[in-house]
Amino acid sequence: MKFACRAITRGRAEGEALVTKEYISFLGGIDKETGIVKEDCEIKGESVAGRILVFPGGKGSTVGSYVLLNLRKNGVAPKAIINKKTETIIAVGAAMAEIPLVEVRDEKFFEAVKTGDRVVVNADEGYVELIE
């Protein structure tokens, strides 16, 4: 299934989805050295490394942008990020770390996507796709 998206940062990625319905704070919420989610939420203990991170949006400190950059430098960044509504902190961090970042407004996408699903993010062509 394909869904339209709005590119915040450019690029293309394919990988396994890591999905939460909760907002994420990168500062304190994700370990910048390991990519493990530390925040008390449904994906606590999971690694964002090499996955398509799907969550409604960010929360928290402006330092979160630098956490995303450090995740990239440490080789544990997500391949791409999908939000419902992207805040500036996530956008700046994704741009600095060269991580494709898109917004999907279609609620059907968020109802359908589950952790472990194969997802293609194509910010350049404006779509995300759930691979069956």
UniProtKB/Swiss-Prot annotation:
Recorded GO MF terms: hydro-lyase activity
Superkingdom, taxonomy of origin: Archaea
PANTHER family named in the record: DUF521 DOMAIN PROTEIN (AFU_ORTHOLOGUE AFUA_6G00490) (PTHR36577:SF3)
Function: Component of a hydro-lyase that catalyzes the dehydration of mevalonate 5-phosphate (MVA5P) to form trans-anhydromevalonate 5-phosphate (tAHMP). Involved in the archaeal mevalonate (MVA) pathway, which provides fundamental precursors for isoprenoid biosynthesis, such as isopentenyl diphosphate (IPP) and dimethylallyl diphosphate (DMAPP).
Lineage: Archaea, Methanobacteriati, Methanobacteriota, Archaeoglobi, Archaeoglobales
Family of the protein in this entry: Belongs to the AcnX type II small subunit family.
Catalytic residues in the record: 61 (proton acceptor)
NCBIfam families: PRK03955.1 (NF003046)
GO biological process: isopentenyl diphosphate biosynthetic process, mevalonate pathway
EC number in record: 4.2.1.182
Keywords tagged on the record: Isoprene biosynthesis, Lyase
Name by which UniProt lists this protein: Phosphomevalonate dehydratase small subunit
Pathway(s) annotated for this protein in UniProt: Isoprenoid biosynthesis; isopentenyl diphosphate biosynthesis via mevalonate pathway
